[in-house]
Amino acid sequence: MSRFSGALQLTDIDDFITPAQECIKPIPINKKNSKSGAKISVQEDGYYEESGTGKQKLQKLEITLQDCLACSGCITSAEGVLITQQSQEELLKVLHENKKLKAEEDNNLSRTVVFSVATQPLISLAYRYKISVEETARHLAGYFRSLGADYVLSTKVADDLALLECRNEFLEKYRENNDLTMFSSSCPGWVCYAEKTHGNFILPHIATTRSPQQIMGVLVKQYLGKKLNLPASRIYHVTVMPCYDKKLEASREDFFSEVNASRDVDCVITSVEVEQMLLEVDQTLPAQEPADLDWPWWDERPELMVYSHESTYSGGYAEHVFRFAARELFNDARPIQLQIDQPRNRDLKEFFLEKDGIVLLRFAIANGFKNIQNLVQKLKRGKGSKFHFVEIMACPSGCINGGAQVRPISGQHVRELTQKLEELYTKLPRSQPDNIGTKKLYDDFFDGFGTDKSHNLLHTSYHSVDKLIPALNIKW
């Protein structure tokens, strides 16, 4: 069974394969002219050998994860590669080797290891081990330090920056064309589906603001690296996320720096993988020695380290952007209430700003592939313009119910588990992205707000993938 979101499991024909079985990616072959025929035989050790006038071992065909992401065929075929490149086994191997390097004298090969932990995994693990979310963060920090982490961070600052960038991007697009529907961009399952299925039709509607994971990558590799006087290649950055799709996002070529020869995020592990790591050594999270999370961003350390954002469970994009736009565009700072348009569909919420019977702003939150598909089809039929902004997440109930959150216990329904996690989320203090710290970060590192540097580092681009259906994809 695939671990990725529903949006990543849909393709034209029979997509659930792995590269080792039948990859449909067309690979160019450099042909050499031959005066005589040749035979290709398979040797005992599995390699192919061409024999004509002589014998020659043929080059092994390799298909990378980047090939999979750039291919219009199967998406889940990348899963086999991710298992080895983005797994807890690979993480533990890297940490073990790094510990040995640090023990050597005059060593310049070891790396500084940084973990960045999102809020949703903390909630999932807190519920599993029946401890508070703050306690979970401290025990997790202690556990990661025991494995070899040098820094353990929350993603709060990246969450804040993502909201600030997204709201200003919406304002710019609205002023250019107030009929344009803008979609959020933090869900990699949704972005990958849009690139591969709808291409250039839908991509101009997607916000270019990077997800918090990738903003965190910039902050760790460049800002923190500068403070530590370390090149990006000497930092190993691990994120803890609620869904497997984040592994795909971290592997995008857009988030690899040729200058620094480094990815913004080197490895992604998930809530359920953390649980598995503990189970494999017969341990529990509360048994780990607690430690404080690190705060390297500015001098004023927050009293608490784990925060929620607005009233939704996936970053709060729709509500935050709505409040900001209502105030900036229409001088309206009234509190809003989420109006559920379809009571039986809790994954589709709509809310609006109305004045004198005229709807000035209409926003929506759409979770789950069914709602995504319906919205895209409405947009194609010219009916999607009634929404100015849509917060989209591929998983039903959003990131709190990510595909890699800790599984329900025996006999527990997924819906019940999700409700418990939502209750924990709503009890968290709410972050205020407009604060002295984020302003200082913009001034010190991004050369100010709205600068070329901030745009280059906090925004990304998307790529339409042309559909190629070669003969190898046909099942007879």
UniProtKB/Swiss-Prot annotation:
Superkingdom, taxonomy of origin: Eukaryota
Annotated signal sequence range: none
Binding site for [4Fe-4S] cluster 2: 187, 243, 395, 399
UniProt-annotated binding residues for [4Fe-4S] cluster 1: 23, 68, 71, 74
A GO BP entry: iron-sulfur cluster assembly
InterPro entries: Cytosolic_Fe-S_CAF, Fe_hydrogenase, Fe_hydrogenase_lsu_C, Fe_hydrogenase_ssu
Keywords for this protein: 4Fe-4S, Iron, Iron-sulfur, Metal-binding
Claim: 4Fe-4S is one of the keywords in the record: yes
SUPFAM superfamilies recorded: Fe-only hydrogenase
Molecular function via GO: 4 iron, 4 sulfur cluster binding; metal ion binding
PANTHER family for this protein: NITRATE, FORMATE, IRON DEHYDROGENASE
Family: Belongs to the NARF family.
UniProt function note: Component of the cytosolic iron-sulfur (Fe/S) protein assembly machinery. Required for maturation of extramitochondrial Fe/S proteins.
Name under which the protein is recorded: Probable cytosolic Fe-S cluster assembly factor GF22738
Lineage: Eukaryota, Metazoa, Ecdysozoa, Arthropoda, Hexapoda
